[in-house]
Amino acid sequence: MRTLPADLTHYKTTPEFTQESVPRGLLRNHTTAAGVWGRIVVREGSLRYVIEGPEPETHLLVPGTPGIVVPEEPHHVALEGPVRFCVEFHR
């Protein structure tokens, strides 16, 4: 699994989302802005992280296994059941 580059600075964290409160936009393909990295942090349950592209990747995120979002890379999440998670942003 990917890791964040060491020279990034955390600047924002979303509120905690659940399977009931996750914004619909996160369930559809979207990207971060140029230079913005994301770190999907699952606090409870599990979440499927799908990276789109010529060779799509799918990862099951659980507590202790974050998903790293590369700038401008199309991706989305899919619900697997009960979950609590947030997204940290770095640049």
List the predicted regions and their residue ranges.
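A short, N-terminal "cap"/entry segment at the start of jelly-roll beta-barrel domains
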Residues: 1-32
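Short histidine-centered beta-strand/loop micro-motifs
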Residues: 26-34, 50-51, 58-60, 77-79
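Short, conserved beta-strand element in jelly-roll/cupin
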Residues: 34-49
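Ligand-binding loop in jelly-roll beta-barrel domains
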Residues: 71-91
